[in-house]
Amino acid sequence: MMLYLLFCSTYGQQTQKKWKKIFQHSNLYLSTLHDGFQKYIRGLSTLEAARDGVRTLLHENNPVLFPSGHTGCSVSALTTQMFYPEYKVPQLHLQCSHCNHTIMINSNRVGRLMHVSHSATGSISQILENHMCHQSQQVCSNCNSPLSTKIKFSETHKIYAVDVTDRNVTLSRTVKIQGLVRATTLHLKGLVYHGGYHFTCRIIDESGNIWFYDGITTGRTSTKKAKFGSVSQPNLKGC
């Protein structure tokens, strides 16, 4: 539902077209979800059918991680799979801090989800910056200087998820994702809370308004709560 609210409810037609392109150019799961959203908007199907179509694909590709029926799955695994850049794979390489010697390495493990460790402190923006470029344990074969791990996306990035399980970090309104040519600024669009197989979310629109959604209490609608910046960080990180 959060992806649907991002795609359709909070913004206008032009933004829907942008999200359509983002979904279709990401992977089969988001492309299928987009098709389901379009059918719902035209009154030809339901949001539940859109969800079930993606769930069937997930189960077919990995029945262990994504079981059918009423059995739950890992939220982290679900997010990783849903956002994995199947068509636009990022580049991961090691670069020497002294002679700039570069080694390309397997980038299949680089997705659009960053896990924030329990020991992390600072803002999400700072943590993400360190994640995208940090010191490795290896040294350069040419000059024995330390090698830095650098992640760069082949195209300007449009969607990224962060898994925050600790409250010692500060949620950032914007973050920067480095591309091959330039960095792209991404704005915080939503927060998902989960526990006991129940999900709620907060959507942040382009004006910084926070909208709350809970399928049990708000049904198919979202309610406007506050402005981003007026809600304390502890309250933002809990629901």
Can you annotate each of these PLM segments?
Residues 1-239:
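UBL (ubiquitin/ubiquitin-like) substrate-recognition surfaces
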